[in-house]
């Protein structure tokens, strides 16, 4: 399956008032990250893989709903100029509630606050994520 790569074109900022429900995970929070993976039906991540991700500059955030880690996204620092909003995932029973948008926006703001070019990608048949990407203000790179 082909992917579509998007680049962010700054068009202003949308303010949301829920920053306390989304936060970055520290390197010491692998257990919490693995809890989210299990809720998504994925295998837990080994400790050495988690630390390697952080060493390479990948940082995860989680969106909590009533204390449950229901959505995640990360920033992948591919270069000194461009960072990517990546690995956006929402627990199936919590989808279609705006959580993918909110967790992606959290990462996007971090990237822009650091003066980097923001990118994001998704599968060409993932129409739900394409709508999120469009709402965030990204345009496809053709």
Q: What are these language model-derived features?
A:
Residues 48-91:
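A conserved beta-strand-loop-helix scaffold within acyl/acetyltransferase catalytic domains
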Residues 87, 91-102, 125-127:
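Conserved glycine-rich acetyl-CoA-binding loop
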Residues 111-123:
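Conserved GNAT acetyl-CoA-binding A-motif
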């Amino acid at each position: 399956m082909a992917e579509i790569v998007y680049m962010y074109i700054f068009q202003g900022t949308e303010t949301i008032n829920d920053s306390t429900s989304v936060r970055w995970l520290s390197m010491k929070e692998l257990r919490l990250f693995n809890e989210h993976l299990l809720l998504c039906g994925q295998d837990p991540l080994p400790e050495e893989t988690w630390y390697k991700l952080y060493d390479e500059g990948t940082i995860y955030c989680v969106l909590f709903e009533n204390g449950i880690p229901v959505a995640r996204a990360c920033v992948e620092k591919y270069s000194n100029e461009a960072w990517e909003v990546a690995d956006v995932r929402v627990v199936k029973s919590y989808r279609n509630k705006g959580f993918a948008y909110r967790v992606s926006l959290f990462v996007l703001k971090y990237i822009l606050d650091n003066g980097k070019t923001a990118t994001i990608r998704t599968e060409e048949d993932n129409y739900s994520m394409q709508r999120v990407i469009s709402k965030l203000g990204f345009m496809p790179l053709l």
